[in-house]
Amino acid sequence: MKKQEQKNKTVFHAVAALLAVLAVVLVLYGGGRWLEKRAEKPETRTQLPQADQETVEVDGVTYRKKSRLTAILVMGVDHDTQDSYEYRKAGQADFLRLVVLDDADKTVQQLQIDRDTMTPVTVLGLLGDRYEPVTQQICLGYAFGDGRQTSCEVTVEAVENLLGGQTIDQYLAMGLDGISTLNDLAGGVTVTLEDDFSAIDPAMTKGTTLTLQGEQAETYVRSRCSVGVGTNEARMARQESYIKQLSVQLDEKLQKDQNFAVDAYDALQPYLTTSMAKGQLVNEAWAAKDYTRLDTIKPDGTYQVGEDGFMEFYPDADALQQAVLQLFYEKVE
């Protein structure tokens, strides 16, 4: 019981970091493509440290599992919030970021997970029956669930598969219809447009400096094909700079007013699905402002177009192994 209370406290201490990380769920990719079953592809990953390994040796260096961690999966989903969803139409988890909280070192570190990462994903039947995992884009697992808890759990399982079975303790997902609310909670974010968005919003011309309000934020972070070079890589770079500024503004508001956590949660709640309780989050929010945020881990990898015409991302084996070690292990001196 004491161990569980300590783990819960770790989660709730970091709500301020989570409010900032909520910014990343703006990385939403319009799609609605058919979720066809993907053929199995051979895996090329280096052997990852498994969750039940307390120590592991890599390249002659011994690593020990960190003991005071909490891992939270944050998801951005390409659906509008509603009470229920048809089978396979719950939306895709187009943004995935794992937030790992270290209560011993008082740090927060994030792992950026590409939506097109190929990994075993559990498939659910129409009545909820579970079938053998199929190697497919990790974003697709969400669609097989109910658009809420089941979808989140399937996605959590897929990320755990990707990371060699490392445990994810909590999850938080937000629908795209919460974008405007989140942006405006921060008071709007000022950006200088390096691409032209005027085909979508006449006020958003290249070179203009403006404070994004409401739907402008959605346009800025979601647009891809009709903007600039049209690549997902370019869009991710644009989103990352936006997220950093939004995070700063959310932090400033929480520093000044502890009740901001309450207001933010209440405003965003209609768009959220989470395993974390509001009351506990709000009560412990104030302590989170002192957590140090480490650089986001972004594993290298290879993109290719699959047989079905959709993009696939295969993370570099060594990069993924190093990410797991950095997040969940520490060197034994």
PLM features per residue range, with description:
Residues 2, 8-19, 25-333:
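Non-catalytic, solvent-exposed segments at the cell envelope interface
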